[in-house]
Amino acid sequence: VISIIPV
């Protein structure tokens, strides 16, 4: 799984 979550 590839998740991109800019936090």
UniProtKB/Swiss-Prot annotation:
Signal sequence region: none
GO cellular component, one term: extracellular region
Subcellular compartments: Secreted
Keywords linked to the UniProt accession: Antimicrobial, Fungicide, Secreted
GO biological process: defense response to fungus; killing of cells of another organism; negative regulation of interleukin-2 production
Superkingdom of the organism of origin: Eukaryota
Disulfide bonds: none
Function as written in the Swiss-Prot or TrEMBL entry: Has antifungal activity against S.sclerotiorum (MIC=32.4 ug/ml after 288 hours) and B.cinerea (MIC=10.8 ug/ml after 288 hours), and weak antifungal activity against F.solani, A.fumigatus and G.candidum. Lacks antifungal activity against P.ultimum, T.viride and R.solani. Inhibits the production of interleukin-2 by activated CD4+ T-cells with an IC(50) of 167.3 nM. Lacks cytotoxic activity against human peripheral blood mononuclear cells.
The protein's name: Colutellin-A
The organism of origin for this protein: Colletotrichum dematium
